[in-house]
Amino acid sequence: VVSPSEMVHSLAAVAARNGVEFLFEQEVVGIDQVAAGAEDGARMVVKTAKGLEVRTRFVVNAAGLFSDKVAEMVGLHDFVIKPRKGEEYLLDKNMSYVTKRVILPVPTKVSKGILITPTVDETIMCGPTAVDTDDRYDLTCTPEGCQTIFSFVSKMCTEINDRQVIASFAGLRAAANTGDFIIGPTAVKGFINA
């Protein structure tokens, strides 16, 4: 078990030390293909809503919920992304005794299931749900999500209930209509889905 935020910060720090430049808050609004033989070797120009233009040989499409929209910018229509909402609930630290290991059920077709997970901070996380939605921006936690999680979790560990919740979180995962992850090169040279 790792701290996801600490892990991402560490990966970003290593990338920056190796020359990666991060451009935050830059919504991609267009990708133009460059004619073959450009002097700088560029194949594409990525355009942002703030007017930035980046000439590049490669585009790695890691846009998550919007990766289908980014792929469409270069004429690819190979997949559709639908958001899958997951809610998780953090329990009070006094519940840390219930497990030191991840407790997980048999996975379903759409999810690894609802887990009981100890965190690096010695709290317990319960969840997530896996609910398909059309809203790519909805990060709300719901009474239905809470009910779903705790009715399931209480069967695995009778000592856990929703009265021990100290925080709740919701996120959206990208679920492709292909039934699998979309990773690899595409028909557009230099455009890679990740």
At which residue positions do the language-model features occur?
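C-terminal catalytic lobe of FAD-dependent flavoproteins
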Residues: S10, T108-D121, D132-A194
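Generic secondary-structure signature for well-ordered alpha-helical cores
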Residues: A16-E21, Q33, E72-G75, N94, ...
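Acidic/polar loop patches that form or flank catalytic/metal-binding clefts of enzymes
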Residues: F79-V80, Y97-R101, E159-A167
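Flavin (primarily FAD) binding-site architecture
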Residues: N61-L76
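Conserved FAD-binding catalytic core of PHBH/FMO-like flavoproteins
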Residues: E88-V131
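General beta-strand structural signal in soluble alpha/beta enzymes
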Residues: F22-F24, N61, C126, A167
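Helical element adjacent to the flavin cofactor pocket in flavoenzyme catalytic cores
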Residues: V2-A36, D40-K50, V54-F58
